[in-house]
């Protein structure tokens, strides 16, 4: 038998969460009186495990925590992100002032812009919300903003100030440049980014 803590990551909702736990315990007591066999109980997700240890019962559901994310800056220090998504620069190109790139001319150069094409797009889980300067990748240790719209199979980034060449490694996220940080840049959460990763990614 199981339930779910609706706001276990938000300590401003501690009273609500504690009431959920009390309700679940009362439910357990009724169930235990009804059945002669042992019933297994679980209620905690990752945030519940970290914030409400007394509610771990028989099992826990460590979802995002298995990827190394805590949903809490204070608790994040105890976890290490384990996922890395990387690609390579497939093409370099220089845009002149007034030239554009991508769907719907999503980026129009107002200065001479050197761009890198990266073969990863929304079919791989990099949502369109990361386009137009919100999202970014890292090339040779430097941050490169995604410009224009995210395409199905590629993104384009500004490498005007980055020394790089075709074939260079591109870090979309890793232990240092985390999925959490990338997700926050577009106003979303790491859950959405990580669970959007397509099967074709190796």
Locations of regions flagged by a protein language model:
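Active-site loop/helix belt of alpha/beta enzymes
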Residues: 2-88, 95-96
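Small-residue-enriched segments and motifs
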Residues: 87-89, 144-145
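C-terminal accessory subdomain/extension
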Residues: 94-202
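Short secondary-structure boundary micro-motifs
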Residues: 72-77, 90, 119-121, 140
């Amino acid at each position: 038998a199981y339930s779910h803590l609706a706001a276990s990551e938000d300590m401003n909702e501690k009273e609500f969460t504690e009431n959920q736990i009390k309700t679940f315990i009362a439910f357990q007591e009724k169930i235990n009186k009804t059945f002669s066999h042992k019933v297994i109980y679980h209620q905690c997700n990752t945030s519940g495990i970290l914030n409400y240890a007394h509610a771990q019962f028989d099992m826990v559901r460590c979802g995002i925590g298995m990827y190394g994310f805590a949903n809490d800056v204070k608790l994040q220090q105890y976890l290490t992100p384990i996922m890395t998504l990387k690609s390579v620069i497939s093409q370099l190109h220089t845009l002149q002032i007034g030239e554009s790139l991508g769907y719907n001319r999503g980026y129009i150069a107002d200065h001479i812009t050197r761009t890198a094409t990266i073969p990863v797009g929304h079919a791989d889980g990099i949502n369109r919300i990361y386009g137009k300067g919100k999202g970014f990748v890292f090339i040779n240790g430097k941050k490169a903003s995604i410009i224009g719209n995210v395409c199905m199979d590629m993104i384009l980034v500004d490498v005007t100030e980055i020394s790089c060449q075709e074939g260079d490694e591109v870090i979309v996220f890793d232990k240092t440049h985390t999925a959490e940080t990338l997700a926050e840049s577009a106003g979303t959460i790491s859950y959405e980014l990580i669970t959007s990763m397509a099967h074709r990614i190796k």
